[in-house]
Amino acid sequence: MHPTLRTVFNLRQQNENTWKDVTPFPDQDAIHHDIARATFRSKLDMTEAYEKMRIRPEDVGETTFSTIFGTFQSRVMQMGFCNAPSTFQWLMTAIFQDFLGRFVHVYLDDIFIYSQSI
């Protein structure tokens, strides 16, 4: 396994000045119940999921950060943004809305697929 660099940001000050999204998260007990009853189950863990979400062009300026190498802006969602989990959950819920509770559940970057038959 190759070592990889992971960018880490201290976003505490930015998060203190950010409006907090209060999108509700799925009921974990309901997810566990549906999956436990299924004969077949799969779990997909999306790698670096937040970093695959683009930030709206008009909001990129809000992501400015400085390093010893210069000042930069992020064009993708970072793990430390306070609204990253709720934004990502909203997106996954929108994508899978027709299947949620039927044979799919989504909790943040995990997709659970379940059924009684193949």
Positions of predicted regions on the chain:
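Retroelement reverse transcriptase polymerase core
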Residues: 1-118
